[in-house]
């Protein structure tokens, strides 16, 4: 099980990562990582970066039947 400090350190080393990547790297359940990232965000230590729909290569994200599931969410240190 990872600690909040390990999540912060991993973000410091890698720059920016998705929550799923952090979960796999630290071998920690996804809901736990999500909670830790939200805690870091509320403390002002991490920031959530969401891709814009214009970044979609096919240009069809706005009408995506999966509800914009193709848009990625990254985390980085502040």
Curated annotation (Swiss-Prot):
InterPro entries: FeoC, Tscrpt_reg_HTH_FeoC, WH-like_DNA-bd_sf, WH_DNA-bd_sf
Keyword tRNA processing: no
GO molecular function terms listed in the Swiss-Prot or TrEMBL record: DNA binding; iron ion binding; iron-sulfur cluster binding
Record-listed iron-sulfur cluster binding positions: 56, 61, 64, 70
Highest taxon, organism lineage: Bacteria
Family annotation (SUPFAM superfamilies): Winged helix' DNA-binding domain
Keywords: DNA-binding, Iron, Iron-sulfur, Metal-binding, Repressor, Transcription, Transcription regulation
Main function: May function as a transcriptional regulator that controls feoABC expression.
Family recorded in the similarity comment: Belongs to the FeoC family.
Protein name (database record): Probable [Fe-S]-dependent transcriptional repressor
């Amino acid at each position: 099980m990872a600690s909040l400090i390990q999540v912060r350190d991993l973000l410091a080393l890698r720059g920016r990562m998705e929550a799923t990547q952090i979960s796999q790297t630290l071998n920690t359940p996804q809901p736990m990582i999500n909670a830790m990232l939200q805690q870091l965000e509320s403390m002002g230590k991490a920031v959530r970066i969401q891709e814009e729909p214009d970044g979609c290569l096919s240009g069809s994200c706005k009408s995506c039947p999966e509800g914009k599931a193709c848009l990625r969410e990254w985390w980085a240190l502040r």
